[in-house]
């Protein structure tokens, strides 16, 4: 079939398998052209491995450090008549390129929050890898079924303690719109912490440790975003921020556990990028469009792969990691450069419907958004007939 983009709200409901493959190849080429990661990991588990930062971590480990990788994700395959999810196509492409390079690459499809998927992962590590020396935790999910209670909990993006009004882009109509968010209830805050906080990360590490599949010296990292003042009301000081602060609490006990075997655990702070998760946050399209404009003009703009490859090379496996006072690894310092933030803040209230494309890089934002789904990739013929039914040969699918 011939597949064109169809966008509804913050989701593109179609995906392009050839475009997704080309996007993965571009990221692999970036890593291989920038040289190997010295003293990098050799056997890596990535939880949330199919898109965005998790995919970039899997690519950086495999093609930067020659690592064997096991990826966990929750995606949907295509059929002859309907495209699958972008993460399915990304993972199919990654596995093919990694296998061609002689690397082990295998994936587990299912709910990473579940005990079942944790057990299947442990069994697969024992059978195929023995032990892993890096665990990357990169889950972004709107809800979680708690494995112990069976309760399904939802996360909420709301401020805490006050109503917040802020500007944003209505990405469908391409107009500036004011949005009012009411404060989160305590139940909503608790739910967000349960879904997006550190409990599941800790459950993963506890399960892997008890099963004896963590190598001596193993490291783990979970990805987070802090942002600057302009996003704090609805992010760091809001319900999501409470979940992110929970990561900072949970990492301490995880670090103690791994340190007993010479290992380490860190929260890694990454910059704002276009992902399926960030595009759902009402103010982020405007913030990202301004940030892209300012950072591109300064020559410091980066996407997922640049961020994560840099994090691996400079901090996770670097001699002098970028650490903050809380012990987090920082890869977001270019975004938080005071000059960059000052310009973003200056432009924030100047943007109107008329000058949207002039004052911001909304065009670049839209391109990056479509690239998530395999569109707008150079060299791909979007008028060609493609088969949406792409197989991942050795996948362990717990959803069927």
Swiss-Prot record:
The gene is fabV. NCBIfam families: EnoyACPredFabV (NF043048), PRK13656.1 (NF010177). It comes from the Bacteria. Involved in the final reduction of the elongation cycle of fatty acid synthesis (FAS II). Catalyzes the reduction of a carbon-carbon double bond in an enoyl moiety that is covalently linked to an acyl carrier protein (ACP). This is Enoyl-[acyl-carrier-protein] reductase [NADH]. Its EC number is 1.3.1.9. InterPro entries: Eno_Rdtase_FAD-bd_dom, Enoyl-CoA_Rdtase_cat_dom, FabV-like_NADH_b, Trans-2-enoyl-CoA_reductase. GO terms for molecular function: enoyl-[acyl-carrier-protein] reductase (NADH) activity; NAD binding; trans-2-enoyl-CoA reductase (NADH) activity. Keywords: Fatty acid biosynthesis, Fatty acid metabolism, Lipid biosynthesis, Lipid metabolism, NAD, Oxidoreductase. Pathway: Lipid metabolism; fatty acid biosynthesis. It comes from Burkholderia multivorans (strain ATCC 17616 / 249). Monomer.
